[in-house]
Amino acid sequence: MTDLRNAEELIAEAAAAPIDGWGFDWLSGRATEERPQWAYARLVADRMARAAAALDVDTGGGEVLAEVPHPPKLLTATEGWPPNVEVARRTLRRVGATVVAVDPDGPLPFRDASFDLVVSRHPVRTDWAQTARVLRPGGTFLSQQIGAGTMRELSEAILGPLPPPAHRHPEHAAAAAEDAGLRVVDLRRATLRATFSDIGAVVWFLRKVIWTVPGFTVDRYREQLLALHDRITTEGPFTAHAQRFLIEATRP
């Protein structure tokens, strides 16, 4: 039987919590997720130290760039979600980055061959032709991306059974990069265990990571949330698996 008061309190708390930026500190102690062995932030820092002009596409709140110890002289970031733009500008001021608000479906607003490094963590989509266009000859694109079927167990707990995922396969990304004239030099994938200790953590995650359950609202899925609360209370933390892949490509 559902402990309705406890469930509703947890849900209400998570529904009211801020979700700006791309940090996940709110989940500390309430959810866990394994990290890929390739250590994306370290790879970015290594390549930034050798770059003259770099671009971070879909920077979120600027969390990755803010940790780069030796940023290049010219450092630019784009962000397409308005609430994140000001967060990123505040975060990245200290590393001297320029944050440009963009239309997520539009072209990159930069001249051809503007950057010798383009990076992107968890982009909404990758426009491979635009990426190739703004890279200088010999330049590098490095990206950690969401893989096909990520958090499928959580999606199905809310939505019910789903068809096999059709998008975000690493092989498709590599083929698209090659079609745009880039040369793929590294392609890796990882399956990462994630746990949610209470229904509040689930609600906050679904509000934040909007592609897990498109159109998610508490009111729309309250019945499913209460059922999942019962499951967590009875069985312990809910487990799902995130899919990630790393792709690195160069412009000849």
Predicted features along the sequence, with ranges:
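Short, glycine-/aromatic-enriched active-site segment of Class I SAM-dependent methyltransferases
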Residues: 146-164
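Short alpha-helix
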Residues: 165-181, 213, 220-223
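A short glycine-rich, Lys/Arg-flanked "PGG" loop and its adjoining helix->strand segment in the class I
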Residues: 126-142
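A short acidic, Gly/Pro-enriched loop at the edge of an enzyme's catalytic core
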Residues: 105-117
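N-terminal, positively charged/glycine-rich alpha-helical extensions of SAM-dependent methyltransferases
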Residues: 1-25, 34-35
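Conserved alpha-helix/loop element of class I SAM-dependent methyltransferases that forms part
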Residues: 19-53, 61-67
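Conserved Class I S-adenosyl-L-methionine
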Residues: 183-252
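Class I SAM-dependent methyltransferase SAM/SAH-binding core
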Residues: 52-108
